[in-house]
Amino acid sequence: EYRRQRQMCIRDREKLAKGTSGFTGADLENLLNEAALLAGRRDEKAITMADLQQSVIKVIAGPEKHSRVIPEHERRLTAYHEAGHAVVMHTLPDLDPVHQITIVPRGQAGGMTIFLPDEDRSYLSRTHLLNSIAGLLGGRAAEQLVLGDISTGASNDISRATQLARKMVGTYGMSDRMGSVAFDAGHDEVFIGRSMAQTRPYSEETAAEMD
């Protein structure tokens, strides 16, 4: 329907398909609407790949916050932070390639590094998960290395890395020390701070070891 409304000049359909992996029908509808608006503002009859790529980012992360004035030192910090993510993710194996880096604020984020998968992953290897954790912490590492200080900008990265590490140990059984056991199956309170009075099928010593 939307392709009938506007001619779409998409030379790299495979790249677009990778960038919209996991999108729902509503997401795709929103994507094409946003791309059509961008083309319309230029009085163009065709939607370009650039329009679609910008629309993908907007659907994922929200609109740009042009009204927000960012101090120069914060823009610099954000640039190094996002570059840190990109360098680590580009260097380590078994990770999705870097697609775009931006320091334009969107939603709650001051910037972001966007990755596009080469393929759909049904299973995640231990190498992929460990390297993903390293990539999440790459922004904090870049701040420390280049600026000599760290900021609260990595708080979401640290939270995601911690959750991923805990899943590797408690859900996926990927810890050499703990073995191939799913400790948190139905008992995730040890990881998310619920009451310790709830029944757990393992000892306090095991819980401490997992932490």
Please give the residue ranges for each predicted region:
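Single conserved hydrophobic/aromatic residue that forms the stacking wall/gate
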Residues: 1-10
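A short secondary-structure junction motif
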Residues: 7, 59-63, 140, 144
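Short conserved motifs of the RecA-like P-loop NTPase core
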Residues: 11-22, 34, 66-73
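Short, conserved phosphate-binding/catalytic loop or strand-edge motifs used
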Residues: 53-58, 107-109
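Soluble catalytic regions of large protease machineries
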Residues: 76-79, 86-211
